[in-house]
């Protein structure tokens, strides 16, 4: 492999798709051979020379390992940079992109472990994707909500409630001041609550809360189904009853289904909330798998208006920088290379719409100053127990979330430092809100 696929003097073309792999070779295997093997197995190579190689231009189509750098602090680990010609990939297909780059190479014997850290999608390829159904700005226009983060709540217990009680919990949260409520990722259409019943009771809750508050409200109705046809049926029903947003589990549902659903949402004026169920199976190991920033990039190409991104709060400082790196990749039009934040390549999205990051998981009102400072306005803060765990009930919990959020936004706009004064801001707001 090394003679053909390791080319350290290669000049990267503007149209090349670039990948950064963290690889650990088996003992005794040279890093150059491993890097070349990764490039070969994820492009034109096979384990032996075949006579049909002479019938094509390998130089035009092969992937090339053009750089290797040792990972600081690790004894036998390298970042291998691989360039793929754009002609290897079908236009507008995330499925084909991932099948080619990570489909086959991860079981390779010469490697102890392999992790895809980042991808550079060139403008020529990015332009073949539709991207999010609507994007952040259109979502704000639809909701008529500006200048603050959006607030949401996942209804708990996630399994076991009847549709009627589920709808009641939705109404109480929306009535209290939240913008959205959410189906949990594993709420589909089980015996205790069929999807059509849930859709109807949630729609009733949305309309009732809207008429009482004068604000646009929504509930992420999970349209994920066992078949694509079933998914379309649920999405179509949601559009018919007039709700503003639906939801999809994009990793378990698959990229092909997600791209199709995204197109449907664009055509029918629905926002699309994306849940990342199963992501940790792929991205949790430090040395093997795919980093979440790659999954976030591919979701932006496939299509989704919201994507769960983790919370940052309470995590380690370095992890905070990395999380903010892929949050920027989700919502900014142009991102500079910055290795301190885990961004290996400069990424230009060519005007593709942004995905709103959703911070969820164990957050409550005391986290609000930090969340407001870290994520800014273009984010959705998704509570669960932080709303429903209020001792007075769901609606007071929602009021507490909304008051805390607006207090933090006002304090920030007045020039106060939320990282230092956040606790004081919340305590001052408590004087005006018994719920908080």
Curated annotation (Swiss-Prot):
<dbReference type="InterPro" id="IPR036376">
    <property type="entry name" value="RuBisCO_lsu_C_sf"/>
</dbReference>
<dbReference type="GO" id="GO:0016984">
    <property type="term" value="F:ribulose-bisphosphate carboxylase activity"/>
</dbReference>
<feature type="binding site">
    <location>
        <position position="185"/>
    </location>
    <ligand>
        <name>Mg(2+)</name>
    </ligand>
</feature>
<comment type="function">
    <text>RuBisCO catalyzes two reactions: the carboxylation of D-ribulose 1,5-bisphosphate, the primary event in carbon dioxide fixation, as well as the oxidative fragmentation of the pentose substrate in the photorespiration process. Both reactions occur simultaneously and in competition at the same active site.</text>
</comment>
<dbReference type="InterPro" id="IPR000685">
    <property type="entry name" value="RuBisCO_lsu_C"/>
</dbReference>
<dbReference type="InterPro" id="IPR033966">
    <property type="entry name" value="RuBisCO"/>
</dbReference>
<dbReference type="InterPro" id="IPR017443">
    <property type="entry name" value="RuBisCO_lsu_fd_N"/>
</dbReference>
<dbReference type="Pfam" id="PF00016">
    <property type="entry name" value="RuBisCO_large"/>
</dbReference>
<keyword id="KW-0601">Photorespiration</keyword>
<dbReference type="GO" id="GO:0004497">
    <property type="term" value="F:monooxygenase activity"/>
</dbReference>
<feature type="binding site">
    <location>
        <position position="154"/>
    </location>
    <ligand>
        <name>substrate</name>
    </ligand>
</feature>
<dbReference type="GO" id="GO:0000287">
    <property type="term" value="F:magnesium ion binding"/>
</dbReference>
<dbReference type="InterPro" id="IPR020888">
    <property type="entry name" value="RuBisCO_lsuI"/>
</dbReference>
<keyword id="KW-0934">Plastid</keyword>
<keyword id="KW-0560">Oxidoreductase</keyword>
<keyword id="KW-0456">Lyase</keyword>
<keyword id="KW-0120">Carbon dioxide fixation</keyword>
<feature type="binding site">
    <location>
        <position position="158"/>
    </location>
    <ligand>
        <name>substrate</name>
    </ligand>
</feature>
<dbReference type="Pfam" id="PF02788">
    <property type="entry name" value="RuBisCO_large_N"/>
</dbReference>
<keyword id="KW-0150">Chloroplast</keyword>
<comment type="subunit">
    <text>Heterohexadecamer of 8 large chains and 8 small chains.</text>
</comment>
<feature type="binding site" description="in homodimeric partner">
    <location>
        <position position="104"/>
    </location>
    <ligand>
        <name>substrate</name>
    </ligand>
</feature>
<protein>
    <recommendedName>
        <fullName>Ribulose bisphosphate carboxylase large chain</fullName>
        <ecNumber>4.1.1.39</ecNumber>
    </recommendedName>
</protein>
<keyword id="KW-0602">Photosynthesis</keyword>
<feature type="modified residue" description="N6-carboxylysine">
    <location>
        <position position="182"/>
    </location>
</feature>
<feature type="binding site">
    <location>
        <position position="276"/>
    </location>
    <ligand>
        <name>substrate</name>
    </ligand>
</feature>
<feature type="active site" description="Proton acceptor">
    <location>
        <position position="156"/>
    </location>
</feature>
<keyword id="KW-0460">Magnesium</keyword>
<keyword id="KW-0113">Calvin cycle</keyword>
<dbReference type="InterPro" id="IPR036422">
    <property type="entry name" value="RuBisCO_lsu_N_sf"/>
</dbReference>
<dbReference type="GO" id="GO:0009507">
    <property type="term" value="C:chloroplast"/>
</dbReference>
<feature type="site" description="Transition state stabilizer">
    <location>
        <position position="315"/>
    </location>
</feature>
<comment type="similarity">
    <text>Belongs to the RuBisCO large chain family. Type I subfamily.</text>
</comment>
<feature type="binding site">
    <location>
        <position position="308"/>
    </location>
    <ligand>
        <name>substrate</name>
    </ligand>
</feature>
<feature type="binding site">
    <location>
        <position position="184"/>
    </location>
    <ligand>
        <name>Mg(2+)</name>
    </ligand>
</feature>
<dbReference type="GO" id="GO:0019253">
    <property type="term" value="P:reductive pentose-phosphate cycle"/>
</dbReference>
<keyword id="KW-0503">Monooxygenase</keyword>
<keyword id="KW-0479">Metal-binding</keyword>
<feature type="binding site">
    <location>
        <position position="360"/>
    </location>
    <ligand>
        <name>substrate</name>
    </ligand>
</feature>
<feature type="binding site" description="via carbamate group">
    <location>
        <position position="182"/>
    </location>
    <ligand>
        <name>Mg(2+)</name>
    </ligand>
</feature>
<dbReference type="InterPro" id="IPR020878">
    <property type="entry name" value="RuBisCo_large_chain_AS"/>
</dbReference>
<feature type="active site" description="Proton acceptor">
    <location>
        <position position="275"/>
    </location>
</feature>
């Amino acid at each position: 492999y090394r003679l053909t696929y390791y080319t350290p003097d290669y000049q990267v073309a503007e149209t090349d798709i670039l990948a950064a792999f963290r690889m650990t070779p088996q003992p005794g295997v040279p890093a150059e051979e491993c890097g070349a093997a990764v490039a070969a197995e994820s492009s034109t190579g096979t384990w032996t020379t075949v006579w049909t190689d002479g019938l094509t231009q390998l130089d035009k189509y092969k992937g090339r390992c053009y750089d290797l750098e040792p990972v600081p602090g690790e004894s036998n680990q390298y970042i291998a940079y691989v360039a793929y010609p754009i002609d290897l990939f079908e236009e507008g297909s995330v499925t084909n992109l991932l099948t080619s780059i990570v489909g086959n190479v991860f079981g390779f014997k010469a490697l102890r472990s392999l992790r895809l850290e980042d991808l550079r999608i060139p403008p020529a390829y990015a332009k073949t994707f539709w991207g999010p159904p609507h994007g952040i700005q259109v979502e704000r226009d639809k909701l008529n909500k500006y200048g603050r983060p959006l607030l949401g709540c996942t209804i708990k217990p996630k399994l076991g409630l009847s549709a009627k009680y589920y709808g009641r919990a939705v109404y109480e949260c929306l009535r209290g001041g939240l913008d959205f409520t959410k189906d949990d990722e594993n709420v589909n259409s089980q015996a205790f609550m069929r999807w059509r019943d849930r859709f109807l009771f949630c729609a009733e809750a949305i309309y009732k809360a809207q008429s009482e508050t004068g604000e646009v409200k929504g509930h992420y109705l999970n349209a994920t189904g066992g078949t694509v046809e079933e998914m379309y049926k649920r999405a179509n029903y949601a559009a018919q009853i007039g709700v503003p947003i639906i939801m999809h589990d994009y990793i378990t549902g698959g990229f092909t289904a997600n791209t199709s659903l995204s197109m449907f949402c664009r055509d029918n004026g629905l926002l699309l909330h994306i849940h990342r169920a199963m992501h940790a199976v792929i991205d949790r190991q430090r040395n093997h798998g795919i980093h979440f920033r790659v999954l976030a990039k591919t979701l932006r190409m496939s299509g989704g208006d919201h994507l769960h991104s983790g919370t940052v709060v309470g995590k380690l400082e370095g992890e905070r920088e990395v999380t903010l790196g892929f949050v920027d990749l989700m919502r900014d039009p142009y991102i500079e290379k910055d290795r301190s934040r885990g961004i290996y390549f400069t990424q230009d999205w060519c005007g593709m719409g942004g995905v709103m990051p959703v911070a969820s998981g164990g957050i409550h009102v005391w986290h609000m100053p930090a969340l407001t400072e870290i994520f800014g306005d273009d984010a959705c803060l998704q509570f669960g127990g932080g709303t429903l765990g209020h001792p007075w009930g769901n609606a007071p919990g929602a009021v507490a979330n909304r008051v805390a959020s607006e207090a933090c936004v006002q304090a920030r706009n007045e020039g106060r430092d939320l990282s230092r004064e956040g606790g004081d801001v919340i305590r001052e707001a408590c004087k005006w809100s018994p719920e908080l």
